[in-house]
């Protein structure tokens, strides 16, 4: 009986030793890839599509809510993108840097979001497709008390709903 168990265990060990190793996974490509097998695909009409096609944010000068020429170009691309996807709605988030009171920055963030919305509406996008919200200084993109951080935080971000 002991010999049979030993023979059976030996056979199992031989079978296990003969099994082939698992195949190697394919090499990882750069994020966003070229659309080949295994790369991340951007879904048309998605937030990622908006970011890649038009850009999702514009920036403002200190304590300002007027639209710069660069911001106007981004909003023009966003309007073109929104025309391609007539069923998509968006929310424009207004943001500020950390300077100023909470109340002041909430109001300034709302003016920034509304200014961006006004440009999109003037470009032919129905106002009913665009909502606005202000986060003031509550959601910084960059944490820090430098001019570079402040500049990145004074923004309006268009978010696909």
Model-predicted regions and their roles:
Residues 70, 74-77, 103, 111, ...:
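Extracytoplasmic/secreted proteins, especially bacterial periplasmic and envelope-associated proteins
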Residues 87-95, 110-141, 154-161:
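A non-catalytic structural micro-motif
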Residues 148-152:
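A generic structural micro-feature
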């Amino acid at each position: 009986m002991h010999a049979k168990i030993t023979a059976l265990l030996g056979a199992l060990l031989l079978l296990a030793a003969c099994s082939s190793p698992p195949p190697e996974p394919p090499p990882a490509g750069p994020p966003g890839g070229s659309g080949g097998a295994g790369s991340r695909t951007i879904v048309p009409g998605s937030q990622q599509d908006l970011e890649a096609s038009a850009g999702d944010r514009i920036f403002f000068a200190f304590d300002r809510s007027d639209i710069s020429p660069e911001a106007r170009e981004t909003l023009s691309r966003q309007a073109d993108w929104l025309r391609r996807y007539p069923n998509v709605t968006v929310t424009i988030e207004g943001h500020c840097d950390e300077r100023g009171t909470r109340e002041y920055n909430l109001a300034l963030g709302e003016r920034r979001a509304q200014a961006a919305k006004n440009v999109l509406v003037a470009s032919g996008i129905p106002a009913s497709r665009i909502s606005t919200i202000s986060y003031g200084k509550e959601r910084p993109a960059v944490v820090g008390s430098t001019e570079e951080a402040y500049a990145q935080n004074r923004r309006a971000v268009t978010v696909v709903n």
